[in-house]
């Protein structure tokens, strides 16, 4: 089966207007899935969403929401290490995910803390996410942990290596916790895509893409996309792919190149 592409409605189809209108525009362009950032928009650059209107648009068009972000953005490692708001809002996020039919919530690591060893912080993340998974047990919502690049977009973030996301996922050891592999972040960090995907294996539960350099649409940078999707397919991943990029042209037109490649990957 061809890969199912999910445009990020924070960045794509903004020409259509509000988020629910972007869902309709994506569907009109032939997409059957979309993704988004935080549902309530408490963390910039996400903005608040009319959840009932968004649900109506998803239902009306038969569009699948593939992923949303956890809220609020949490600095897990920075003293005093109070995670209560994260756990409280996690339940709210799961309720919204259920309402919108979204099977995944994206989580992160926050900023690393210079006063603690890296390994200690990774092990703390395991405990934090074990508790999170236990809290939402029975929800059928999967938490996916994203490593991000620190060279360009997220300086100071603790998790900047796919291998460390995989380490945390192995430690959590749950079918409802896995790795979000972002090919853009991985490439910017200089990782070997094939090696990282092979090492992470079936821990990869979601994928996002953008070209590099620039974080524009596939075809705007230097990534060899036929090769990249071939590597992804060879790794065994057959789930949806989020299109999380900043388009340099009209949204639908910006998707044409990667849609052609994904159709035969």
Segments and roles (model prediction):
Residues 50-60, 128-136, 196-199, 227-231:
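Catalytic-core regions built around general acid/base machinery
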Residues 1-103, 174, 246, 252-265:
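N-terminal pre-domain/capping segments
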Residues 15-16, 20-23, 76-81, 155-162, ...:
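Gly/Pro-rich active-site loop or hairpin
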Residues 57-60, 76-178:
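Active-site acidic/histidine proton-transfer and metal-coordination neighborhood
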């Amino acid at each position: 089966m061809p890969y199912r592409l999910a445009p990020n409605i924070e960045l794509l189809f903004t020409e259509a207007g509000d988020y629910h209108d972007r869902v309709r525009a994506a569907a009109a362009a032939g997409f059957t899935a979309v993704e988004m950032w935080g549902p309530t928009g408490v963390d910039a650059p996400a903005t608040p969403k009319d959840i009932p209107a968004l649900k109506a648009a998803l239902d009306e068009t038969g569009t699948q929401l593939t992923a949303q972000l956890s809220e609020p953005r949490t600095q897990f490692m920075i003293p005093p290490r109070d995670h209560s708001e994260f756990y409280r809002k996690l339940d709210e996020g799961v309720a919204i995910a259920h309402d919108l039919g979204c099977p995944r919530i994206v989580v992160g690591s926050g900023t690393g803390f210079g006063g603690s060893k890296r390994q200690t912080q990774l092990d703390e993340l395991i405990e934090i996410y074990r508790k999170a998974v236990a809290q939402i047990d029975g929800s059928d919502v999967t938490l996916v942990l994203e490593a991000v690049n620190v060279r360009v977009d997220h300086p100071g973030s603790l998790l900047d290596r796919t291998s460390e996301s995989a380490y945390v996922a192995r430690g959590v050891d749950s079918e409802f916790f896995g790795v979000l592999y972002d090919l853009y972040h991985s490439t910017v960090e200089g990782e070997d895509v094939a090696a990282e995907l092979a090492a992470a294996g079936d821990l990869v539960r979601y994928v996002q893409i953008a070209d590099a350099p620039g974080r524009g649409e596939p075809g705007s940078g230097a990534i060899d996309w036929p090769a990249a999707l071939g590597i992804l397919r060879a790794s065994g991943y057959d789930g949806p792919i989020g299109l999380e990029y900043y388009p340099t042209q009209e949204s639908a037109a910006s998707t044409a190149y990667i849609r052609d490649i994904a159709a035969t990957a």
